[in-house]
């Protein structure tokens, strides 16, 4: 029987596509705004939400989403204060989330196997509820980036110019930080906390080899991201190795191949 006939593998393929679309769009904004470190801080802070969910006995995804959104808003708020640097704010929420997660998982009654699944992920365990979450966020991202692409690009590359055009920069920054937090949480089941930031950066860095256009970079990120997911699934199935690590490994291989190809392409053709 073909592996494609199994429901869990069909869910993995659909989840990969939805995650590639979502991460392709949001990740392009992250890379353009140079928010990779902040996104990494939010990712690690989500451990606190997962630990709270495990300890209280309800969905770790919901608690991680709430905790990550609050952490994102907290980092954004502290980053705009003159008495605290951005990297210091990230470190505070990063370590706060990790400490809360460790304490809650230690105090949780019984064995907590769910915690390790969120740390390392397994795309083959993606559930229909995970697909609904990914699909909803991907649809919202498509609508937002289609309708508000020019303002988002303006704010991503030159926030001061955007302010001079009377664009609501602060409001949009908070909303995008919350969107980043939800995107991270939605992808935890696929690759886990340890590797989720890679889905939001490696395809974008690969796309950036060939173009500096925000729109083309987002589209190429979706293609390279999905290619990495498919290749990772293939390796995971045939060699019985963790799917999350396989996806990231293949994504990095794609980056290296594209980097090699770019050396033979004149710079003016990549603009």
Give each language-model segment a name.
Residues 13-18, 61-66, 91-92, 131-136, ...:
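Hydrophobic alpha-helical transmembrane segments
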Residues 6-11, 82, 90-150, 178:
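Transmembrane helix-bundle core of multi-pass membrane transporters
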Residues 130-203:
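Helix-loop-helix "hairpin" substructures at the membrane interface of multi-pass membrane proteins
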Residues 190, 194-245:
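Transmembrane alpha-helical segments in multi-pass inner-membrane proteins
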Residues 28-111, 207-219, 236-239, 263-264:
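Short loop segments and helix-boundary regions at transmembrane helix junctions
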